[in-house]
């Protein structure tokens, strides 16, 4: 079966931004103008096509990355609409991993906001080419050029306008295309009657100036264009388009467009720009992976190459488990068997679908460059590689952030117990930032996630989708332990009970590890003082103790343990004895290494009328916050601060009452920092049951 669209005419793009910048509305308009839907769905009415979970429609926010296929000007466009709330950052992360290009949506009033920076960093991490759509140009206070300045200053991007708005706020009537040097005037509310006209006389000077800036910026991307521009002082429309595309693909240029998705202005021009400037799968470097022998290899975006794909999302579905895949090379056919090379297991492909939000179309095959979903995979989870059994490869996987907040969940009845465990398994399969564990002392089930809203949504889904009745505990902070010093540790486990005894003895040296290294073990035993078969159990004992913590019961991070000495008994030594000795040595070492408690620090941004500035700063300081910056613009104050997560519970309510409901804030995880001694002592004491 031949391709519907050649690879050069395929675009895999994401729409990403800060919450409320208008991503989902932009996606809805794209679907309307490209003919996927025949009626416009509004987010605030709960009718958006890409917001199809009950919670999304109620809250007016996008939680999961919905994948949709559409077409425009004889091109296939696969779109992922990603959430803007930081609690769902994994959805953005996994989208970025499988996309070729991104439309970053900014609010013309709010400009560069905290989550915009997070999304931009995620796109940087995966080297995704991008363009900018400055949305909400119809809103009071909209300022396209102010946003341009913020993108250059705060995101350090070489942003260049390729459009200018005609009017702003309530007067937005059209858009100037600086490339074609034409004006597009919107004649009806639906945005379907557009008149092409000359640039308005009162904007001629401004347009000439910005068009010249565009030509200069584009000329710098290519030596041949520089020569042309210096000779004639002009670049043709084709030269400009070619230069902008080259600049975008090389990450040297970010074209900026403008409009109002809600008022149906500018969206068709965004679609044109996606085709003109964002890459096809063949324009981006081939995906890299590792072969079974450990050597690196690439898979070109080509149907004739060996099949390889990355599972980037798993979702429970009424018809079975849906696994979303990005096809990188080769062809995947219905009914075939493939290898999950990450887990070393064979999987059968029972059905293949492409999606239009909660609508689906069955297909016989997926090809290189496609985004689609597979039904029937048993053991594949997010980040796994699927490939041909004859030519195995493991592709680069996803970066998965650690959860920072947890709550205890208790089923109300025995019947709910079974439903709860099924629900937790299904939800954890879908969302790698959602962790489930059992508290060894209390036996309670504890769930952890990226923030209060994240856990709230998951608990809500347990009730709705899995009909689990459960009591939910108060949120708890995910603290960590670490060490600041170096020392030796010794563990000797010796027990005689008449008959065969138990004996294990290890000596270790302990020191702080590299940041992000977790637990690192080095074996420096010489001369067989500890036999080979007991090294692994000793390491396991240390690792398990590391995971359960020493001073307050929280996982210990960034520690290096070197096994240097020990002793054994021919008869009494066993794996269990050395595992216990390893654990004892680890605890002994930690206590001598200046152990400290770490807590998650959040990057907090608050916006409120200027009158409340003093109260907000005072309140943040009382929460152990450090104010890092403040500004006042048009009567609105913006404060950025770093505050411990432990001090931020209930902040939304407090801010509302402090600002008479006129303050808003956003918060995202920044780093782990040492807890002040007096606060740490209280936490340790409470966890040891002394409070």
UniProtKB/Swiss-Prot annotation:
It comes from the Bacteria. Residues 8-282 form the tr-type G domain. CDD domains: EF-G, EFG_III, EFG_mtEFG1_IV, EFG_mtEFG_C, EFG_mtEFG_II. GTP binds at residues 17-24, 81-85, 135-138. Keywords: Cytoplasm, Elongation factor, GTP-binding, Nucleotide-binding, Protein biosynthesis. Transmembrane segments: none annotated. Gene3D superfamilies: 3.30.230.10, 3.30.70.240, Elongation Factor G (Translational Gtpase), domain 3, P-loop containing nucleotide triphosphate hydrolases, Translation factors. One of its GO terms (biological process) is ribosome disassembly. GO terms for cellular component: cytoplasm. It is found in: Cytoplasm. Catalyzes the GTP-dependent ribosomal translocation step during translation elongation. During this step, the ribosome changes from the pre-translocational (PRE) to the post-translocational (POST) state as the newly formed A-site-bound peptidyl-tRNA and P-site-bound deacylated tRNA move to the P and E sites, respectively. Catalyzes the coordinated movement of the two tRNA molecules, the mRNA and conformational changes in the ribosome. Belongs to the TRAFAC class translation factor GTPase superfamily. Classic translation factor GTPase family. EF-G/EF-2 subfamily. This is Elongation factor G.
